[in-house]
Amino acid sequence: MGIFTISDQGYKKTLTLQSPADLRVVGNYDCASHEDIKSTMSKSRIAQKKWAEVPLIYRAELMHKVIDVIIENQDHIMNVVMEETGKPIQEAMSMEIFSAIDSLAFYAKRAPKWLRDEKRSMHGPMSFLKKTKVTYKPRGVVAVITPWNGPFILSINPTIQSLLAGNSVIIKPSEVTPRSGKLVEDIFLMADAPQDLVQVIIGDGLAGAQLIDEVPDKVSFTGSIATGKKIAKQCSENLIP
């Protein structure tokens, strides 16, 4: 569980993280300020424009590199998840590690087919003179807001799909499981993903609200109904899907 304290400066929140299994302190983190979030969004937009130009086949190759990194670091990932959530090792392995590898392989294999241009037939007396094609384009920056109960898999799964489609990602993990979310950023960097393509902001609900204030191009949310309603209302002000 996470406990927030206010620093002496009075404007910077510090998160002290305790393991629910034995209540020992497992980390201290500075929460992102509004200026930090603005900077993160700015860097994400720059990274996304470059990433959108990368051919899909190379985006898929990145996912296979990430699989290798996860396998090489599976013990560390499981330890972080277990410390933050109190999960037993079997659940950490099956829900977080196996599921992440499965998602990476699944979407990397199918994305080239799902995202390729599609020819469509038209209706009408002059349809034989017309040609129609559907082309999929990246949305831009995707904000991924995740809960505590599947902190690694629920962060990496929407990240995989977003990146394959040519988007960049900013993850806002639960304040009680920030390290698991931060692992996703670290793992993609270890797999040689471009700098700032995947970023993480640490903070409470206010940080999540401030992230949406920066108007990402899409929001992926998993969590409670109450929080979902707040996010949906906030997104509706800027028509964010």
Question: What kind of feature is each model-predicted range?
Answer:
Residues E35, E72, H76, K87, ...:
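Short alpha-helical
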Residues K65-V69, V80, I101-A108, I187-A191, ...:
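Alpha-helical structural signal in soluble globular domains
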Residues D30, I145, I170-S174, I201, ...:
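Active-site-adjacent beta-strand anchor residues
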Residues M1-K130:
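N-terminal Rossmann-like NAD(P)+-binding subdomain of aldehyde/semialdehyde dehydrogenases
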Residues S121-P194, N238-I240:
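Conserved small-residue-rich beta-alpha loop and adjacent elements
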Residues V141, D192-P241:
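Conserved NAD(P)+-binding/catalytic subdomain of aldehyde/semialdehyde dehydrogenases
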